[in-house]
Amino acid sequence: MIVQRVVLNSRPGKNGNPVAENFRMEEVYLPDNINEGQVQVRTLYLSVDPYMRCRMNEDTGTDYITPWQLSQVVDGGGIGIIEESKHTNLTKGDFVTSFYWPWQTKVILDGNSLEKVDPQLVDGHLSYFLGAIGMPGLTSLIGIQEKGHITAGSNKTMVVSGAAGACGSVAGQIGHFLGCSRVVGICGTHEKCILLTSELGFDAAINYKKDNVAEQLRESCPAGVDVYFDNVGGNISDTVISQMNENSHIILCGQISQYNKDVPYPPPLSPAIEAIQKERNITRERFLVLNYKDKFEPGILQLSQWFKEGKLKIKETVINGLENMGAAFQSMMTGGNIGKQIVCISEEISL
């Protein structure tokens, strides 16, 4: 059988901006037979995420993710349906997910590398397992639980940068659920600001491209900032940190403004901002959700419950077609998405 796949065509360079042309689509032969323990799956949805920018470099700069290889199939979060199985615990028609799903229309995988998912947890919206009820949602929930030091009724103010993205749009809502009295989002368009306050429960939103961020932050956070969920790094984070209170906490989720630059992760703070951090005893620790695998199952159930109760509002931006993976990635890296950026490969979930 002939199937389509996406491979890494070129690297943008450590300081380069990724473009759609860094990827290319090609056809490949898929064997007709599968071996014991394997399954043949049809890809339904694929995820593009900021961390993938590191995988485009020859050296990712981390020990927990490997680089993509030139002319080899690209992989990441994915959801699919099993079409044929020779694995004892997986049967035809099961929906499965993996963090290392090849960007390919159909693929033969080791069944042990897949996790079965229950469509009832997402009311049939399978793509949510790649977003708010998947790794981004878990990153937001566990990050806030482990590093935010929020308790019910603690009257804390939380600021979220990259607030209209996959993690940020969920993190702000969770901040309220867990006890923050005020949540302020920072994002890059007027449309996103309106969405945050009108649909996602943020108390205020700042457009960093138009507003004076320092001024708007003082207005929106009159009592200062107690918790900062940092998705972007760079100048925005410097501005937020300068308005943080004593003994406050930074949840270091991502640094998308720095991902196209050859700097260590997390990037060091400037001397002036580092001095503020030390003076005010602000904690700033790298947070890696993969270190909390024991919390994944209860976390998914909690996120699903909030969603089913109508409390957790889920936003996603969907592009159709494997041929658009590169365009979707480029768009996500430049803020073209609201909520989770998803690529729909096949919507046909019947066999």
From Swiss-Prot:
UniProt GO BP: prostaglandin metabolic process
Signal peptide positions (record): none
Positions that bind NADP(+): 165-168, 192, 208, 231, 253-259, 287-289, 337
Superkingdom as given in the UniProt entry: Eukaryota
Tissue occurrence: Widely expressed.
Matches recorded under InterPro entries: ADH-like_C, ADH_N_2, GroES-like_sf, MDR_fam, NAD(P)-bd_dom_sf, PTGR2
Enzyme class: oxidoreductase
Record keyword Glycosyltransferase present: no
Catalytic activity, EC: 1.3.1.48
GO molecular function, one term: 15-oxoprostaglandin 13-oxidase [NAD(P)+] activity
Subcellular location per the Swiss-Prot or TrEMBL entry: Cytoplasm
Catalyzed reactions: 13,14-dihydro-15-oxo-prostaglandin E2 + NAD(+) = 15-oxoprostaglandin E2 + NADH + H(+); 13,14-dihydro-15-oxo-prostaglandin E2 + NADP(+) = 15-oxoprostaglandin E2 + NADPH + H(+); 13,14-dihydro-15-oxo-PGF2alpha + NADP(+) = 15-oxoprostaglandin F2alpha + NADPH + H(+); 13,14-dihydro-15-oxo-prostaglandin E1 + NADP(+) = 15-oxoprostaglandin E1 + NADPH + H(+)
Binding site for substrate: 99-100, 288-290
GO cellular component labels: cytoplasm
Keywords, ordered alphabetically: Cytoplasm, Lipid metabolism, NADP, Oxidoreductase
Pfam families membership: ADH_N_2, ADH_zinc_N
Family: Belongs to the NADP-dependent oxidoreductase L4BD family.
Description of how the protein assembles with itself and partners: Monomer.
Role noted for this protein: Functions as 15-oxo-prostaglandin 13-reductase and acts on 15-keto-PGE1, 15-keto-PGE2, 15-keto-PGE1-alpha and 15-keto-PGE2-alpha with highest activity towards 15-keto-PGE2. Overexpression represses transcriptional activity of PPARG and inhibits adipocyte differentiation.
Name of protein: Prostaglandin reductase 2
Species, as recorded: Homo sapiens
Taxonomic classification: Eukaryota, Metazoa, Chordata, Craniata, Vertebrata
